[in-house]
Amino acid sequence: MTLAVPTASVAADDATDDEIRSSQQLNDGRTRALPPGDRWDEDRQATRRARALLQRMTLEEKVDMLHGEVNNYYGFYNAPIERLGIPALTMADGPAGTRIANPDVNGQRATQLPAPISLAATWDLALAEQYGDLAAEEAFSTGHNVLLAPAVDIARVAQAGRAFEAFGEDPLLSGTTGAAELRGIQSNPVVGDIKHYNVYTQEVNRLAGGNAVVDERALQEIYVRPFAIGVRDGRPGSAMCAFNKVNGTYACENDELLNTILKEQLRFQGWVMSDYGATHSTVRSILGGLDQEMPGSFTPDEEPGTCFFCGPLLEAVNAGEVPVSRINDAVLRILRPMFALGLFDMPPQIEPLPEA
């Protein structure tokens, strides 16, 4: 069963104490608002509970949700807000199975799944859904509640080192396979992350501002289409913007890509996180549609760097450069799928994985 991120907007003051009580307790694995395995009525409660919780957050707590950090235990990590019982976001890379960062967790071993490009070659959507389900089950059992998959990039450059992570050069096949994998991932209390948005087709200069120049028709018919299908049919809780520039503007601060196309045209309801080290500004990025900077104060080489969404974002809000309403929107986009997919009520576990 796949839990869809709700699109309804319900007033926060309609929320009852029972509906938000898990938000007021520490999410430590011992207190649950529902029995293990039960699902929230996502059409009625997720948005309402998210809005109610948002009202209880300070500005500093809201900004804390909008950037991550590198944590030795999880690798990719957003710290919990214990005062309100908001659980940590513990992320694992996962285009071809869960990548475990902590050597103490199952010896960093998980099932090595076939390359996604091979999965797409089967044209088997039921298999793609099983693929996502298995990857997410192992992510959850190794302490993670966000799986950074699937990648629906169009594979057009044979030399691209990560082409195997995508589903090939066909937009329809990429979108439908990615949507099926997302349904499998999110049948667990795990957020799927559709990536890398957009026109991320080669590795050369990817961290040095490589610029993809593309006209409107090609952008919409080739590069946007797999994301459109994935958002419509897979309902991902998150999306990841890419390293590269598109028509001269970094993807993670590109107003046309993130606001006009992804959030307005495609009606994407989740949150946009940056690829790891793909944020280059504070005000331009948050106003351009980026909701969460990852991994915060570390570069892709795990060296300390500038965190644009840490102190600088708080300063920009206090200076009037970024409206509080934009911060609220970004936080709500994170909280809503967290509620809808059960992250507040079914904490990930550390369990041995079965071995053949």
Give the residues covered by each predicted segment.
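C-terminal segment of classical bacterial N-terminal signal peptides
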Residues: 2-9
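Glycoside hydrolase catalytic-domain context in secreted enzymes
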Residues: 10-356
